[in-house]
Design a protein with these regions (language model features):
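Short, solvent-exposed amphipathic alpha-helices that sit
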Residues: 7-11, 38-61, 75, 79, ...
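Structured segments of extracytoplasmic/periplasmic soluble domains
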Residues: 14-22, 50-57, 82-86, 108-112, ...
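Loop/turn elements at helix/coil->beta-strand transitions in domains of secreted/extracellular proteins
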Residues: 22-26, 54-63, 89-93, 115-119, ...
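Hinge/cleft segment of the Venus flytrap/periplasmic-binding protein
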Residues: 145-191
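Short beta-strand segments enriched in small/hydrophobic residues
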Residues: 25-38
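Hydrophobic alpha-helical segments within soluble ligand-binding/sensing domains
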Residues: 1-27, 74-77, 125-129, 144-162
Length: 191
């Protein structure tokens, strides 16, 4: 499963580099109802705790969290579009908690000419997200170690087949994807 402590620390490290030297930095965590879990709540709490401890004199962080009801098609796209159209509500830093939100935010940054006005930390990686990181439209992304998930899944299946149950909790690591390492996440023919 997702290690909320490590993931929270990874997000905090990325957000810390985006804080204004003086004054308030607004940071919004954006997730969808399909991606919102207990783990994402724990990640948010971890980031809040760490940012509070790390901020320097004169810095403050306005941390908010919003969960888009994604029960109908295009709900996420509509919410993100509305957020960018009413740009007085735009945060300084937008933290995307899933791949769909990340890709919607990327498209909205371009469509509404907000590239550079909002710093974005994405989640996971797709060709679209990797291209956005290479173009410096998205600052970075946090991704789970998919190889490790595969190995742990096989281990749990082996344990289940041999013992009739599996009761281990497998904590999966994550990686921070930046412009410097996007090539590591592309398939061989894309490099």
């Amino acid at each position: 499963g997702l290690n909320s402590y490590q993931t929270g620390s990874a997000y905090t490290e990325q957000i810390s580099g985006m804080l204004k030297a003086q004054g308030t930095t607004s940071v919004m965590f954006l997730s969808t109802s399909s991606s919102k879990t207990q783990e994402t709540n724990l990640v948010y709490s971890q980031v809040k705790k760490e940012l509070e401890a790390q901020k320097k004199t004169g810095q403050s962080v306005d941390l908010t969290e919003y969960c888009v009801d994604s029960s109908a098609d295009f709900d996420t796209e509509e919410f993100v579009r509305d957020m960018f159209v009413n740009d007085e509500n735009l945060p300084d830093v937008l933290v995307c908690m899933d791949e769909v939100v990340t890709e919607c935010v990327y498209q909205a940054l371009i469509d509404y000419n907000q590239v550079g006005n909002v710093k974005v930390i994405g989640f996971y990686y797709s060709d679209v997200i990797l291209d956005a990181i290479d173009k410096e439209i998205i600052s970075s992304a946090i991704a789970l170690d998919m190889d490790e998930i595969g190995r742990y899944s096989v281990n749990a299946l082996d344990e289940y087949l041999s013992l009739g149950h599996s009761n281990n909790y497998y904590s999966v690591n994550q990686h921070v994807i930046t412009k410097e390492n996007t090539k590591d996440y592309r398939t061989e023919d894309e490099k």
